[in-house]
């Protein structure tokens, strides 16, 4: 009996995580098909997994950033600036791609009444104001509410202050970071069980029937995100590292994108991305900052959602859109997307802001938001998968470009276990 339990534990904690997630996905679909009532009860497993990730992620970011900065040695290289440039470029190109897709495949919405009481920001300045307020938030509130801008600000500040501390204190911060990292590894190994619960309960509850009426706009959204993930981002990676980008792209989509697709939370996927960077032997001083930063501002998927749904509303109302206005919308969508993580409801609640460019009333814009909510089962999942996998993709890209030794031993060649 003990041997059987030991085998199960070894399989769960030492087997291939990707294969286990795939098994959980298939099992979830089968359960939802064969026993939908039982599948609905499995939502507890998914909710527990997401709650566990959201619980450990803020603490993980805090201690890793603080420890890496506190223990940073003079002359030790980090690569945050080029990663930040890639984040912003990719978000703008994603919005631009969405504009082109909207012109080539115009969508028409059947606008519905939305009864929800929503409070979207009125202009871009309000979005930026919200981000700045988050930066100076109370540190305890930032940890409790998962405010990663505030967490980053306090972690960076304390890390800089602790640079002047004794070696013993610095070692303590590193030991604490290692302890939290080990705890996170245990949570990540439970991903197959969590995804099994999420998939089975979601399919059993919705059956994807709500998606049928909005299939066209959904296909444009998903197609655009796939194009960015498989064409635009690889081109950016190739420009940076001057070699075949697809082994790295596929590894990031497989390791990070699949998990993010089902958790539907960039914040919850931070530990997954951190673990992937660690397995790739990337610079911890770099990825401990770039991954949580990416979860906050690298929002290509959000830029696509804002752009396509806004232009769908414009097309529905028969408004003409010229190229300069479309380019301006791309820029606005990119800026709005960078603030999406600081707005309750994310990218959908920023659609009225983009709609205001075209003089669309708030009432009509909210009906577009309602459409987004209806297709959110797939839209939000695909958006999060693109956003989160791109975080680790660009972090790895810059690290590889600046350290050729990483090319000889990438994750794509050591992904058997």
UniProtKB/Swiss-Prot annotation:
Q: Where in the cell is it found?
A: Cell inner membrane
Ranges that cross the membrane: 21-41, 49-69, 83-103, 142-162, 193-213, 218-238, 291-311, 331-351
Q: List the disulfide bonds.
A: none
Q: Which GO terms describe its molecular function?
A: neutral L-amino acid:sodium symporter activity
Question: Which superkingdom?
Answer: Bacteria
Q: Which reaction does this chain catalyze?
A: L-serine(in) + Na(+)(in) = L-serine(out) + Na(+)(out); L-threonine(in) + Na(+)(in) = L-threonine(out) + Na(+)(out)
Q: What does this protein do?
A: Involved in the import of serine and threonine into the cell, with the concomitant import of sodium (symport system).
Kindly provide the name given to this protein in its UniProt entry. Answer: Serine/threonine transporter SstT
Query: Which organism does this record belong to?
Result: Proteus mirabilis (strain HI4320)
């Amino acid at each position: 009996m003990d041997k059987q339990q030991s085998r199960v534990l070894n399989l769960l904690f030492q087997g291939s995580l990707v294969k286990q997630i795939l098994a959980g996905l298939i099992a979830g679909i089968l359960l939802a098909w064969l026993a939908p009532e039982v599948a609905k009860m499995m939502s507890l497993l998914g909710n527990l997994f997401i709650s566990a990730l959201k619980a450990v992620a803020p603490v993980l970011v805090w201690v890793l950033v603080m420890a890496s900065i506190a223990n940073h040695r003079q002359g030790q290289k980090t690569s945050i600036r080029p990663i930040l440039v890639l984040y912003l470029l990719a978000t703008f190109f994603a919005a631009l791609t969405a504009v082109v897709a909207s012109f080539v495949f115009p969508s028409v919405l059947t606008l519905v009444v939305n009864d929800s009481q929503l409070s979207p920001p009125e202009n871009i300045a309000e979005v930026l104001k919200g981000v700045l307020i988050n930066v100076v938030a109370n540190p305890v509130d930032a940890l409790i509410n998962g405010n990663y801008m505030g967490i980053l600000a306090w972690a960076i500040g304390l890390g800089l202050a602790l640079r002047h501390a004794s070696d013993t204190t610095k070692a303590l911060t590193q030991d604490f970071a290692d302890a939290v990292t080990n705890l996170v590894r245990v949570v990540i190994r439970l991903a197959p069980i969590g995804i099994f619960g999420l998939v089975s309960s979601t399919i059993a509850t919705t059956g994807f029937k709500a998606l049928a009426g909005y299939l066209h706009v959904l296909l444009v959204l998903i197609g655009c995100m796939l194009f960015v993930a498989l064409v635009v981002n690889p081109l950016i990676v190739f420009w940076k590292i001057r070699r075949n980008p697809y082994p790295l792209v596929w590894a990031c989509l497989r390791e990070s994108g699949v998990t993010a697709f089902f958790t539907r939370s960039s914040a919850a996927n931070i530990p997954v991305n951190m673990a992937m960077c660690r397995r790739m032997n990337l610079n911890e001083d770099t990825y401990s900052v770039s991954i949580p930063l990416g979860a906050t501002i690298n929002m290509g998927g959000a830029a696509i959602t804002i752009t396509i749904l806004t232009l769908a509303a414009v097309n529905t109302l028969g408004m003409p859109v010229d190229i300069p206005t479309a380019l301006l919308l791309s820029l606005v969508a990119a800026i709005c997307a960078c603030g999406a993580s600081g707005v309750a409801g994310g990218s959908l609640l920023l659609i009225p802001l983009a709609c205001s460019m075209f003089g669309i009333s708030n009432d009509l814009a909210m009906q577009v938001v309602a459409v987004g909510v209806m297709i959110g089962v797939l839209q939000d999942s695909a958006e999060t998968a693109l956003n989160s996998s791109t975080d680790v993709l660009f972090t790895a890209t810059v690290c590889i470009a600046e350290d050729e030794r990483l090319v000889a031993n990438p994750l794509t060649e050591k992904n058997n276990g």
